[in-house]
Amino acid sequence: HALHPETPMHFFWDKQDADEVTKVDATLSFHQIDDVKFLNRMAGCRAYASTAGFESICEAMYLSKPVLMVPAHIEQDCNAYDARQAGAGIIGESFDLESLLRFAGTYVPNREFIRWVRSCERQIIGELERLADQHSAVTVPTLTNYFPI
């Protein structure tokens, strides 16, 4: 933050005794975790930095936001690797705002991912209809169900 004081930064945390919003200065704020507020902030941001949690990286990809991922454990390492392969962003050893801003300048969103997400309702309904068709055939009970042989 000290190197880029002009860049607004919003962080979300679950600090027990903190206010709803802790404003450090004009461009640095900490917010209590709130799903709706988080997504609204992400929708309006220029770029996103994360420890590479699966959901937030997918949300950033859907919203066409470049991502800096700094994984903290093995599951996040795997998420970061997959996300980088999908074009979501870059992986760093630390939260380096300069790297994120530089990447944001060249970022190209993965439009195929967005199309895939938007197709999920159609795919799910199609699969449910296919399964319903398989199970809707009339079965006629055999006599062995009623009389022991």
Regions found by a protein language model. Name each.
Residues 37-79:
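A donor-sugar binding/catalytic signature common to diverse glycosyltransferases
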Residues 36-38, 99, 123:
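Short acidic active-site motifs
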Residues 66-108:
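Nucleotide-sugar donor-binding patch of glycosyltransferase catalytic domains
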Residues 1-47:
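Donor-nucleotide binding loops and adjacent catalytic segments primarily
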